Curated annotation (Swiss-Prot):
Its cofactor is Mg(2+). It is an enzyme of class 2 (transferase). UTP acceptor binds at residues 107, 123, 179, 229. This is Cyclic dinucleotide synthase CdnE. The keyword 4Fe-4S does not apply. Keywords: Antiviral defense, ATP-binding, Magnesium, Metal-binding, Nucleotide metabolism, Nucleotide-binding, Nucleotidyltransferase, Transferase. A motif (Pyrimidine specificity motif (R/Q)xW in donor pocket) lies at residues 328-330. The gene is cdnE. The (R/Q)xW motif controls pyrimidine nucleotide specificity in the donor pocket, while conserved Asn-229 is important for recognition of uracil in the acceptor pocket. Binds 2 Mg(2+) ions per subunit. Cyclic nucleotide synthase (second messenger synthase) of a CBASS antivirus system. CBASS (cyclic oligonucleotide-based antiphage signaling system) provides immunity against bacteriophage. The CD-NTase protein synthesizes cyclic nucleotides in response to infection; these serve as specific second messenger signals. The signals activate a diverse range of effectors, leading to bacterial cell death and thus abortive phage infection. The effector protein for this system is membrane protein Cap15. A type I-B(UU) CBASS system. It comes from Yersinia aleksiciae. UTP donor binds at residues 109, 257, 274.
């Protein structure tokens, strides 16, 4: 029998993964008219818009199990490809219009394939190569410059803003964010955050010359504070650990991001970022996350275990680093409340899954029942 609570969540998840009615309207127009309207390869979505995804036929009806399985899956690769192509459109315009030597990189959820929206935002780093910051303790050889990197980044930001307004006259270029520009609308079917920056050559990068060890320097335009970040090391370390567990980390991250989105839709916002959630699950047990085909509920079991342990031992949680080691995941005591909210969402859904498996509506999930879920095949 369908579960009304999960019927609503499943419908929201379908919309999230395939797009809102307005997004689909533009997509459909692009397909039928074969217009270049932000859907860089309109044929990519021709099938996706109308066909169901494989997870929609797994489990029984609109159940907690079907919801969990669906929440773990990547969005269709054709949506993700269009996200990258939208970033490439921005890159091409900036390359042509700016008198700067620039490098471009995509960071965030999309390159990690942990986004849960078909029409996901894209984070595009634009990196001015005329100068860089470097760790003086490294072994590299550099020539000093009299230029202030903060001025270089702010000038790049202003030039990029003007170039984007010229290249995409019907789009909105928002210059209010302290660290990035945001371009939306017009012919673009993805919101793109454009992050002006320069390279930061870490000690490790100077030694090994691996790009994952190379960082970037960005600026808070309001305070002129330099912010050093290592997005490629974040991506590399999560990918490497995910490879150890048959994709289990990505599935757990998507699951938690979906629960967070549904919590907001149901009236309770959870103030943890996508970056925080990904960093949190990086500390999960890879062996526990490892699973065979059709045994994905093992991912839910480990997600439940880790969140409950950290919620009950917050002093341990506050010692955990983000994957690239640049800061702690939880930097303030108030984050405990947000972790508790997310944990409660997991606890609620894992109990519903257990009840669907056992057929006993009074069952409550506990760690001693983990094998019931781990051994359950979901076709």
């Amino acid at each position: 029998m369908p579960n009304p609570a999960f019927s609503a969540r499943i419908e929201r998840m379908k919309l999230r993964r395939k797009g809102t009615s307005d997004q689909l309207r533009v997509a459909t127009e692009s397909i039928s008219n074969q217009r270049y309207d932000g859907l860089e390869k309109y044929t990519l979505l021709e099938d996706v818009l109308h066909l169901s995804e494989s997870w929609e036929n797994r489990g029984k009806g609109d159940s907690a199990i079907r919801y969990i399985i669906g929440a773990m899956q990547p969005v269709d690769a054709r949506y993700t490809e269009i996200s990258f192509e939208t970033a490439s459109r921005i890159e091409n315009q900036l390359s042509k219009k700016l008198a700067h030597n620039l490098d471009f990189r995509v960071q965030g959820s999309v390159p990690l394939d942990i986004h849960i929206k078909g029409f996901s935002d894209v984070d595009l780093l634009i990196i001015d190569t005329q100068m860089l910051m470097y760790d003086v303790n490294g072994g590299g050889s550099y020539s000093p410059t009299s230029r202030d990197g903060r001025d270089v980044i702010i000038e790049l930001r202003e030039a990029a803003r003007d170039a984007l307004e010229m290249a995409f006259p019907t789009a909105l270029v928002d210059d209010n964010n302290a660290k990035s520009l945001r371009i939306t609308g017009g012919s673009l079917q993805r919101e793109v955050d454009v992050v002006p920056s320069i390279w930061w050559d870490t000690k490790e990068y100077q030694s090994m010359k691996r790009e994952e060890d190379r960082g970037v320097t960005i600026i808070d335009k309001n305070t002129r504070e330099r912010i050093y970040n290592a997005p490629f090391l974040h991506i590399k370390r999560i990918k490497d650990k995910c490879d150890q567990c048959n994709g289990g980390i990505r599935k757990s991250i998507r699951l938690l991001k979906t629960l967070k989105a549904d919590s907001k839709d149901e009236g309770s916002d959870i103030d943890l970022s996508s970056y925080d959630i990904a960093s949190l699950m990086f500390h999960a047990d890879a062996n526990n996350l490892n699973h065979s085909t059709y045994y994905e509920l093992a991912v839910l079991v480990e997600t439940h275990r880790l969140l409950n342990y950290l919620s009950q031992n917050y002093e341990v949680a506050m010692q955990l680093d983000v994957p690239n080691g640049t800061r702690k995941i939880f930097e303030k005591p108030e984050s405990h409340v947000e972790l508790l909210k997310l944990t409660e969402m997991v606890n609620s859904v894992v109990t519903e899954v257990l009840r669907e498996i056992t057929g006993r509506p009074t069952d409550f999930y506990a760690n001693d029942k983990c094998d019931v879920l781990r051994k359950q095949m979901v076709y």
